[in-house]
């Protein structure tokens, strides 16, 4: 499938499944080395990161836990910039190495709020792992520890990312066709 139609928009393949798998495996290898002996807990940001987080966990070679938090800042194809926590964190993070697993970092506002909320839980350290990063959209100063793909400022769907709730099941990543 080179192109797909979701609702009123058309999308074309931009990152094939094989390339995603290769990058996720490479990221997991690096993270496994970095996190050896650190008792990490991954916090996947729902809904977009659930496929990435699952694939990443399966490739890890060190013991780690995973939990999920739900935040929202999107409406349609644009970020609202307003973040609201929907589902909180129940795990004790004190003294733990926390790895936030995100599908995409754009402005950085969601990530900044997440890091601030984690700070009150006294983690040993907080690292950020994102599947996609749009450097030209970044408004907040962030240290992204692990980035699978730096991409241009185009709207994408697939591999967990959606357009109004649709398209998450696509194995490839698709870019909107203007």
Positions of PLM-derived features:
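PRPP-associated nucleotide enzymes
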Residues: 1-178
């Amino acid at each position: 499938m080179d192109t797909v139609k979701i609702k009123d928009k058309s999308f074309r393949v931009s990152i094939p499944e094989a390339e995603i798998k290769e990058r996720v495996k490479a990221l997991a290898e690096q993270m496994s080395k970095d996190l050896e002996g650190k008792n990490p807990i991954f916090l996947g940001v729902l809904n977009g990161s659930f496929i990435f987080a699952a694939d990443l966990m399966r490739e890890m070679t060190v013991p780690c836990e995973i939990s999920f938090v739900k935040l929202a800042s999107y409406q349609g194809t644009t970020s609202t910039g307003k973040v609201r926590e929907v589902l909180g964190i129940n795990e004790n993070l004190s003294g733990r190495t926390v790895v936030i697993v995100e599908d995409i970092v754009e402005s950085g506002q969601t990530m900044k709020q997440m890091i601030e909320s984690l700070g009150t839980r006294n983690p040993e350290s907080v690292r950020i792992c994102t599947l996609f990063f749009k450097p030209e959209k970044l408004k907040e100063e962030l240290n992204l520890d692990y980035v699978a793909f730096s991409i241009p400022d185009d709207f994408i769907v697939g591999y967990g990312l959606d357009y109004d709730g649709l398209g998450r099941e696509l194995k490839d990543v698709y870019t909107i066709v203007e």
